[in-house]
């Protein structure tokens, strides 16, 4: 990458508090763009709208999802906007490029009985289950991101207020409450999980060697739980986040509260969770519609 691109990434890190994960995505987008420039014998400074359209076609030819293409174009549009503030001769070739529409999807979630089955799998008090259960409890009870989970320190847990302070996107702190089951799980883990009693750091969630667990490690733990649970398949940390939001909304929580708990900046981001299960839809319909049931039906 050239010095302008490096300065751009540094600005995102210092002034806009972008996470390392987000910065890595921006960096990868710029590297791929540079490879295209080299392949087509194009220059960054003379890149124009026609070239931008060709680049869009190039991305689609690599069989990328529309969401990925949309993000890559957004990265380059933002980069050129930054460059324009430094050089008045620069023109943003991506400003008129129409964003590819993102695929619409309903977030996947677990039904309540599926969650109960997952918890039943880790209910026996073995050393591994103590750790696995606290991971499952925290993700489901709080809806936090896996990146937030792995960075929780022991001092972030507030047993007086029954909640945890996490560092979210943009380095923003938020407090998320948890319930009695999650509290008990954390207490049992801290008291009986041997690696945490002998480690020399403050991270809460550890691997079996006593080291701070990684995001990949969390995914491995969740996949292992699913393998041991009958009737449940396909799990990932964000699915538990979807489940957290869906179950709250299904039980009557308002959208603003869920937005705050999830740490979303925009309410529209939380809006995707307003879907409900078919079972819940039918329940609401049967109870609400005047002609949903005959008089002799219950």
From Swiss-Prot:
Q: Where is the active site?
A: 145, 169, 238, 241, 264, 273 (o-(3'-phospho-dna)-tyrosine intermediate)
Subunit comment for this entry?
A: Forms a cyclic heterotetrameric complex composed of two molecules of XerC and two molecules of XerD.
One GO process term, biological-process aspect: DNA transposition
Do you know which InterPro entries this protein is assigned to?
Answer: CB, DNA_brk_join_enz, Integrase-like_cat_sf, Integrase_catalytic, Integrase_recombinase_N, Integrase_SAM-like_N, Recomb_XerC, Tyrosine_recombinase_XerC/XerD
The record ties this protein, via NCBIfam families, to:
PRK00283.1, recomb_XerA_Arch, recomb_XerC
What PROSITE patterns is this protein classified in?
Answer: CB (PS51900), TYR_RECOMBINASE (PS51898)
Q: Which CDD domains match?
A: INT_XerDC_C
Return the Gene3D superfamilies for the record. Answer: 1.10.150.130, Intergrase catalytic core
Q: Does Cytoplasm count among this protein's keywords?
A: yes
Give the main location.
cytoplasm
Gene this protein is translated from: xerC
Per its record, how is this protein called by name? Tyrosine recombinase XerC
A single Gene Ontology CC annotation of this entry is:
cytoplasm
As for family, the record states:
Belongs to the 'phage' integrase family. XerC subfamily.
Stretches assigned to the Core-binding (CB) domain: 1-84
The protein's location, in the record's own words, is:
Cytoplasm
Naturally occurring in which organism (per UniProt): Staphylococcus aureus (strain Mu3 / ATCC 700698)
The free-text function statement in the UniProt record for this protein reads:
Site-specific tyrosine recombinase, which acts by catalyzing the cutting and rejoining of the recombining DNA molecules. The XerC-XerD complex is essential to convert dimers of the bacterial chromosome into monomers to permit their segregation at cell division. It also contributes to the segregational stability of plasmids.
List, alphabetically, the Pfam families matched.
Phage_int_SAM_1, Phage_integrase
> Does DNA-binding show up as a keyword for this record?
yes
**Which keywords appear in this protein's UniProt record, sorted alphabetically?**
Cell cycle, Cell division, Chromosome partition, Cytoplasm, DNA integration, DNA recombination, DNA-binding
Instruction: Output the superkingdom of the source species.
Output: Bacteria
What SUPFAM superfamilies does its record include?
Answer: DNA breaking-rejoining enzymes
């Amino acid at each position: 990458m050239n010095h302008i691109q490096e300065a751009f990434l540094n600005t995102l890190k210092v002034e806009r508090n972008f996470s390392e994960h987000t910065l890595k995505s921006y960096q990868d987008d710029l590297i791929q763009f540079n490879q295209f420039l080299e392949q087509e014998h194009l220059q960054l400074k003379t890149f124009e709208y026609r070239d931008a359209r060709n680049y869009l076609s190039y991305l689609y030819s690599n069989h990328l999802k529309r969401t990925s293409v949309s993000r890559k174009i957004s990265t380059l549009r933002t980069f050129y906007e930054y460059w324009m503030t430094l050089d008045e001769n620069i023109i943003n070739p991506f400003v008129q490029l129409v964003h590819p529409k993102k695929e619409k999807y309903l977030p996947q979630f677990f039904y309540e009985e599926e969650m109960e089955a997952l918890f039943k799998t880790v209910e026996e008090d073995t050393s591994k289950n103590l750790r696995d259960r606290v991971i499952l409890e925290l993700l489901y009870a709080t809806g936090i991101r896996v990146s937030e989970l792995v960075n929780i320190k022991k001092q972030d847990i507030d047993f007086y207020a029954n909640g945890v302070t996490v560092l979210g996107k943009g380095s923003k702190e938020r407090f998320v409450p948890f319930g009695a089951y999650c509290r008990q799980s954390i207490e049992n883990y801290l008291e009986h999980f041997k690696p945490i009693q002998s480690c020399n750091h403050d991270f809460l969630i550890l691997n079996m060697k006593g080291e701070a667990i990684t995001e990949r490690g969390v995914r491995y733990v969740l996949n292992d739980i699913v393998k041991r649970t009958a009737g449940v398949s396909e799990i990932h940390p964000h699915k538990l986040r979807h489940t957290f939001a869906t179950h709250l909304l299904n039980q009557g929580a308002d959208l603003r509260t869920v937005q705050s708990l999830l740490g979303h900046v925009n309410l529209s981001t939380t809006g995707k969770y307003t879907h409900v299960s078919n079972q819940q839809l039918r329940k609401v319909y049967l109870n609400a519609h005047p002609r949903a049931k005959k008089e002799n039906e219950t």
